[in-house]
Amino acid sequence: MAAVELILLQRVEKLGQMGDLVRVKPGYARNFLLPGGRAIRATKANTERFEQQRAQLEAQNLKRREEAERIAERVSGLSVVIIRQAGESGGLYGSVSSRDIAVAITESGLSVNRQQIQLDQPIKMLGLTDVRVVLHPEVVLPVTVNVARSVEEAERQARGEAVGLAAEEAAAAAEAALIEVADEEEVEISA
């Protein structure tokens, strides 16, 4: 199929800035750009109308961006805790998706929807994970997601302590290092 020409109404990551004339596949235009209000078809009438409204659209975009920057500044360093069941190795029974993260962030006081969460893949292990929340196409807020089995475990993870098998392995490695040093110095360790 032939590519579709569109005029972007806002910045779209990896595609272009507001006002750019872009060529995209029909499905991308039909399913993402057009219904989301991110672009309009590049007909002669739409091009003329866009040029007439360009200043107004840029002013609206600037206002939305400034509001998003204020919100990002107010909640910078945001960290949310998500409690999930997990096995001994730290693998979750299930996963944490963008929907779960959006609910946790909304409960902490910042209203977001799951489409604003940029998550490369679902979280399937306990621990801290950094995700991006897109408040505006030009404003991205980093959020730390702390996935743990309990609130106490989440607090330990937030302090940087290892949990689960990782904690046991760290303790065993520390003990092995202590024994190795003691052997080198020929000191007896009593258990």
Curated annotation (Swiss-Prot):
Gene3D superfamilies membership: Ribosomal protein L9, C-terminal domain, Ribosomal protein L9, N-terminal domain
Entries under InterPro entries matching the protein: Ribosomal_bL9, Ribosomal_bL9/RNase_H1_N, Ribosomal_bL9_bac/chp, Ribosomal_bL9_C, Ribosomal_bL9_C_sf, Ribosomal_bL9_N, Ribosomal_bL9_N_sf
GO-annotated biological processes: translation
Single GO MF annotation: structural constituent of ribosome
HAMAP family registered for this protein in UniProt: Ribosomal_bL9
Assigned protein family: Belongs to the bacterial ribosomal protein bL9 family.
One annotated Gene Ontology cellular component of this protein: ribonucleoprotein complex
Function, in words: Binds to the 23S rRNA.
Ribosomal protein recorded as keyword: yes
Protein known as: Large ribosomal subunit protein bL9
Record-linked NCBIfam families: L9
Organism: Granulibacter bethesdensis (strain ATCC BAA-1260 / CGDNIH1)
Record key words, sorted: Ribonucleoprotein, Ribosomal protein, RNA-binding, rRNA-binding
Presence of keyword Ribosomal protein: yes
